Regions:
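Low-complexity, glycine- and small/polar-enriched segments
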Residues: 1-278
Length: 278
């Protein structure tokens, strides 16, 4: 049924208090494994993104990238400016429960019920939320040890903005140069991670400045000292610091037992307008 037809039947057409959003759920009474990259940016229903749920009564293993809010699945893919999907990822799911995030009991003593994200893979979206629930463990960077685990990442990114969105940025000179990929996102979703056992992150020696970059200078008097306005931004292609809400939003992590080597970040981006003083 088209989304517009459903809104009409519910009497919600033109009512700004309601948001009608499609849902897609894949469930398994055993294990569930994602083996191919999913680019959800083309998954729109009457223009609306979906709430995508992957629920496994056993283990949920993500051996591929799950992405929305970007043009593609590569770390360097461009951030989009439209709304994006919300993601629900559940291992050890209680499939009989009304709550889509409900998990079976037992916690760390269980023999299954994990959610695992493989190395070099991403789970990300833009304006949607990421909700992850594991009856036992959440393993970020599964299949590797030491610093190699850091190559997996889970984050919300917000949506891309332009200077046209903000009249006060008239005269802003964007950063340029080799390797510069500036993005000033807004409207990012929340990240919520809950495990009955452990949350296992990836050891990272990465500096924040590797993915939160900056350009431009001013004097103490506020005069521009370069041709580029001072600004700082997110370089999504370089982000390898575990978990983040990179374009707004909150991060919440809870574990029934331990949290190991997990980095969680909530950065900002900014850009002032104006022109060099003559």
């Amino acid at each position: 049924v088209p989304m517009g037809t459903m809104a009409t039947r519910l009497g919600l057409v033109g009512d700004a208090r309601f948001l009608l959003q499609p849902g897609l759920e894949i469930r398994s009474t055993g294990d569930l494994t994602l083996v191919n990259d999913w680019n959800l940016s083309s998954w729109r229903f009457d223009g609306a993104p979906a709430v995508v749920s992957l629920r496994a009564a056993g283990n949920l293993t993500l051996n591929a990238t799950l992405s929305d809010g970007f043009d593609g699945v590569l770390p360097t893919s461009a951030l989009r400016s439209d709304r994006s999907a919300s993601l629900r990822l559940v291992g050890g799911a209680d499939l009989a429960a009304a709550d889509p995030l409900a998990v079976l009991g037992g916690g760390a003593e269980r023999t299954d019920g994990d959610v695992a994200l493989a190395v070099n893979k991403l789970v990300r979206t833009g304006t949607g939320d990421i909700e992850l629930a594991a009856a036992r463990h959440f393993d970020l960077g599964a299949g590797a040890t030491g610093v190699n685990r850091r190559t997996a990442a889970l984050y919300t990114a917000g949506r891309a903005t332009s200077t046209d969105d903000y009249p006060q940025l008239a005269g802003f000179t964007p950063p340029s140069g080799t390797g510069v990929s500036a993005s000033y996102p807004t409207g990012g979703g929340d990240v919520r991670i809950q495990a009955g056992g452990d949350v296992l992150g990836g050891i990272t020696h990465q500096l924040v400045t590797e993915w939160q970059q900056r350009r431009g200078r001013t004097s103490e008097a506020g005069t521009l000292l370069s041709s580029q306005n001072p600004s700082w931004w997110i370089n999504f292609g370089n982000f390898q610091q575990n978990v983040g809400a990179l374009g707004g939003g909150d991060v919440a992590v809870s574990a029934g037992r331990h949290v190991h080597n997990l980095s969680a970040v909530i950065p900002t981006s900014g850009r002032p307008g104006g022109r060099p003083r003559r």
